[in-house]
């Protein structure tokens, strides 16, 4: 029986408009706007490339087998190591797990904590990043590790659908050309309880399906983009001031304890892998210009680098120890150009073979 408040006789009248033509017009406007946006972003320097997402990292992490050659680190091995040259020189295709803007320790730990893994790790050490006690650098790596462990079917399917689109469409640049990225470009001043962090570098590299990063030519050559990337490094590599609500002495003590723990944990993980027959070689990749001066001042070589090697007993390759590695110039102070990365890797391979005792093994 109908309710007294219901009206079963109601009929919505659809206005007599040319709806099919309107739908076609809206579709054409959307297509035109999409094409215009794509043309515009390409005109300001963007190009189609994969986003280095947590899902892409998780996909790559799953390629690690018990005997794999794995690259772990920050953005420098991401840019500076050529996978083809490493495969040619070391005999196996490496798995690229480096991440830009991250502390590599959580990834280092994740790989070694896999009890089935007994392979080789090439690990980059940038002390200001490796010994970060917490914050975004550590959180970036932890999110990637967590995604690999908890990725849902929906996230996996979304990633598979996104890859062919990102390879062809320039404006699908996450964190820069999406709404969130564009909003981040609005300048805000620091406030007493809300400090604005340093700006991240703009688009200056391409990423392929194996997560091989290559500096784009516009950044490799002197110009506005190169200067913009350069000018961003010093603020990013300057530790933030202690929180105003924490006494400076207590803050320094807490950070000091975290750094000491990181030294201890690094050595323990190297030993853990060594007992399973695995190997680790630490590498200090080229850095030049004002950024090198800045890093040398804050973390002298005689400090963190030497101690990591001493505590862990692992071999290390420092670019400054070898003229053929030290002669490279980083266009934007922190990474090698795409052509230089190939030559650098070619020159690095003999040192890796020596550090990993591959020459001795081959001779026997």
What are these regions (language model features)?
Residues 20-40:
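Hydrophobic membrane-insertion alpha-helices, especially the h-region
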């Amino acid at each position: 029986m109908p309710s007294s408040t219901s009206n079963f006789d109601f009929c919505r009248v659809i206005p007599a408009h040319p709806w099919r033509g309107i739908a076609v017009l809206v579709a054409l406007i959307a297509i035109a706007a999409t094409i215009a946006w794509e043309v515009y972003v390409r005109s300001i320097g963007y190009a189609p490339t994969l986003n280095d997402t947590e899902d892409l990292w998780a996909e790559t992490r799953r390629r690690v087998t018990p005997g794999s050659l794995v690259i772990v680190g920050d953005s420098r091995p991401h840019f500076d190591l050529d996978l083809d040259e490493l495969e040619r020189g070391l005999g196996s295709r490496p798995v690229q797990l480096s991440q830009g803007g991250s502390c590599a320790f959580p990834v280092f730990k994740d790989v070694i904590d896999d009890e089935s893994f007994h392979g080789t790790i090439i690990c980059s050490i940038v002390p200001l990043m490796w010994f970060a006690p917490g914050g975004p650098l550590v959180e970036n790596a932890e999110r990637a590790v967590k995604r690999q462990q908890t990725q849902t079917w929906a996230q996996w399917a979304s990633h598979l659908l996104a890859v062919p689109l990102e390879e062809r469409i320039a404006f699908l640049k996450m964190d820069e050309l999406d709404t969130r990225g564009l909003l981040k470009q609005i300048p805000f001043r620091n406030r007493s309880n809300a400090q604005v962090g340093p700006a991240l570098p703009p688009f200056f590299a391409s990423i392929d399906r194996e997560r091989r990063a290559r500096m784009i030519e516009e950044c490799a050559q002197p110009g506005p983009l190169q200067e913009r990337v350069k000018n961003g490094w010093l603020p990013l590599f300057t530790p933030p001031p202690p929180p105003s609500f924490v006494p400076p002495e207590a803050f320094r003590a807490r950070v000091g304890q975290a750094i000491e723990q990181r030294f201890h944990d690094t050595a323990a993980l190297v030993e853990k892998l060594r007992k399973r027959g695995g190997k680790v070689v630490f590498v200090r990749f080229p850095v030049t210009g004002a950024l090198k001066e800045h890093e040398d001042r804050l973390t002298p070589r005689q400090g963190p680098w030497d101690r990591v090697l001493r505590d862990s007993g692992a071999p290390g390759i420092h670019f400054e120890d070898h003229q053929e590695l030290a002669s490279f110039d980083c266009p934007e102070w922190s990474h090698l150009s795409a052509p230089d990365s190939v030559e650098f890797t070619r020159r690095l391979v003999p040192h890796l073979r020596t550090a990993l005792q591959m020459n001795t093994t081959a001779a026997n």
